């Protein structure tokens, strides 16, 4: 992170073609209203003081009041922190998939979190492996993203336990499985088809209540 004229920016060093690709992906996601960081620039033809070539960098705006998951666990070392982060990540993943975005590397590490009325809101911060499909995602791509998320989350939680940031009693596999169930439930509520008779308005109210939850 770099302080620049009362602004904070994030600088990510990557190859030139990858930097331009991620920049365009993030721009398109911002245009679509996705919860993600805002790209600012790609800087190329960099060199150190000795004249040696350096990789290009992608510059993004720092997301105010956001924290990476490790910082949150260092502040709130409670088992429920893990489940709340998973719930936030599930909401983010559903929103991205509805926009036709395949992430390709879903993880807590590639996400920033903000506190939101006792819960957390999640934001995509790394789109390097992503793909935007204007025609929508296939079920195969959605399920693969979920499987990647589960695997990565379990590994990240185990790493937190090894670093004494998460209680040993927490079942990391069970928490990792939660991303699958939460995503599946939310996706079904948002996209599932239901048929109502004229006299079953209570089912409409019930559907709205599920959406609000």
Label every model-predicted segment.
Residues 14, 116, 136:
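Surface loops and adjacent helix of pleckstrin homology
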Residues 206-213:
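Long, charge-rich C-terminal accessory regions
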Residues 10, 112, 123-124:
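Structured core elements
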Residues 113-119:
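Activation-loop N-terminal segment of eukaryotic-like protein kinases
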Residues 120-196, 200-203:
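C-lobe/activation-segment region of protein kinase-like
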Residues 106-113:
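Hydrophobic residue at the +6 position relative to the catalytic HRD Asp in the kinase catalytic loop
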Residues 1-83, 87-104, 120, 152-154, ...:
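Conserved ATP-binding subdomain of kinase catalytic cores across diverse folds
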Residues 64, 108, 129:
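Short, glycine/acidic-enriched loop or turn micro-motifs at the edges of active sites
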């Amino acid at each position: 992170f770099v302080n620049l004229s009362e602004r904070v920016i994030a600088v990510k060093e990557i190859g030139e073609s990858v930097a331009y690709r991620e920049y365009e992906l993030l721009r398109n996601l911002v245009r679509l209203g996705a919860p993600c960081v805002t790209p600012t620039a790609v800087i190329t033809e960099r060199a150190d003081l000795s004249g040696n070539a350096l990789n290009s960098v992608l510059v993004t705006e720092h997301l105010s009041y956001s924290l990476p998951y490790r910082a949150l666990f260092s502040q709130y070392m409670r088992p429920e922190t893990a489940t709340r982060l998973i719930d936030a990540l599930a909401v983010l993943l559903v929103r991205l998939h509805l926009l036709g975005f395949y992430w390709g590397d879903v993880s807590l590490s590639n996400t920033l979190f903000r506190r939101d009325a006792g819960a957390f809101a999640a934001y995509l911060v790394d789109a390097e492996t992503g793909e935007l499909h204007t025609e929508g995602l296939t079920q195969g791509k959605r399920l693969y993203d979920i499987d990647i998320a589960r695997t990565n989350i379990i590994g990240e939680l185990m790493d937190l336990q090894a670093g004494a940031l998460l209680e040993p009693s927490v079942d990391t596999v069970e928490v990792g499985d939660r991303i699958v169930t939460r995503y599946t439930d939310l996706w079904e509520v948002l996209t599932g088809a239901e048929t109502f008779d004229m006299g079953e308005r209570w089912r409409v109210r019930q559907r709205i209540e599920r959406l609000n939850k």
